[in-house]
């Protein structure tokens, strides 16, 4: 039997992304944002992804992109029918340490959960 998912509110698919779009990417040669959130155009409510973007922008002190350059990957598209999903892409930039990015991400996610749930 599968896991009981009734208490799970949102699935998160989190990755890092290159600072500059590689040749075969949707944005070849372009500088990417620090954070890109994707909902596959509907795998989570618009209010949620907007709220998450706002919470992350507060802690990172940078604008957060939504569905640019990514619109959601295989996991968000495949499982978005079962429950809400969001994809989070974090830049591999050296402008911020991994510890800073991790701490800000956790703070932003906590703010989001307190706001939405």
Placement of each model-derived feature along the sequence:
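His/Asp/Glu-rich mid-to-C-terminal helical/loop segments that flank catalytic regions of hydrolases
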Residues: 96-117
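Catalytic cores of processing enzymes, dominated by hydrolases/peptidases
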Residues: 1-97
């Amino acid at each position: 039997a599968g896991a009981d998912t009734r208490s799970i509110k949102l699935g998160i698919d989190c990755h890092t992304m290159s600072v500059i779009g590689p040749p075969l990417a949707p944005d070849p040669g372009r500088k990417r944002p620090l954070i890109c959130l994707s909902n596959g155009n509907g795998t989570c409510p618009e209010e949620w992804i907007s709220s998450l973007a706002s919470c992350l922008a507060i802690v990172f002190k940078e604008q957060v992109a939504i569905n640019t350059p990514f619109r959601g990957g295989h996991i968000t598209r495949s499982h978005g029918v079962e429950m809400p999903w969001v994809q989070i892409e974090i830049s591999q930039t050296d402008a911020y340490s991994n510890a800073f990015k991790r701490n800000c991400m956790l703070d932003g996610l906590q703010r989001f959960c307190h706001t939405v749930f």
